[in-house]
Amino acid sequence: MKTKFSPLTIGLFVILTLYVLFMLVIFAWVILTASKGYYGDYSSFEPDLYPDNLIGLPKEFLLFDNISEINNGFSDGTLLSMAGNTVLYAVGCSLCKVIVTCVVAYLCARYENWFSRLVYSIVVVTMIIPVVGSQAAEIQMAKDLQLYNRIWGMWLMRSNFLGMYYLVFYSVFKSMPKGYYEAAKIDGANDWKIMTNVALPLVKYTFLSIFLIVFIEYWNDYLIPNLYLPEYKTLSLALYQQSQGQELKGDMTYLQQVPYVMATVLLVTVPVIILFCVFSKRLMGNLSVGGLKG
């Protein structure tokens, strides 16, 4: 029996196919551009190889040479140290954020009282009402508490339960049959063991999905490191500064040329793309049905 597709389904398929092809073309252009070289005097805007060959194949494959120049082009660190700072910042902040959110959501879903309802209301209100103008006060508070310019300080500051992921965890725990908890209590488990040995293992795939999404958010974040971690440059911050011609050695301002910027873009995006490809099924499946599955 042949499957019939409606015109709407066919139209959506064509649109999504064109969108995927468009994104692949852009990624291919980034790779080709990052492999091209720079010739000429940037200060006088003389023609170089890139403007003369915008979309064609590179005459020489210079990607690794460009990366090597970028590695030596910053006045305050190498790419390896920036990558280390990025991993510490992204992994630490993601773990603190997701663990705190998961535990608070479990407690509010398990123990229903006025306080848990207040916490739920605070989360919803903070998502609806934008908080504007608090950045200066937050920076001053971080300095007063000795959290400023410390990666572990950022871990503590990101250890909060506010945001959409609280609602996801809350929905998951709320949908769990109470029989699990009652059976564990009959077997002699206390509240701590019920949480760690029963509830949390049941949401491990939802936890992993949310952790990966939050990790990608922090990996691509350059604003917070720029404001709070001036001595711990991340790759995303390096990309921003390079594109603006900041923190480059005096004789290497040409690194803000497009081929070199695209090479840094690859360094920032390729790890995330690999991570997403490896865990794509886990990401798309568990989070989308996180409120229905235990």
Locations of regions flagged by a protein language model:
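A structural signal for multi-pass alpha-helical bundles of membrane permease subunits
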Residues: 2-294
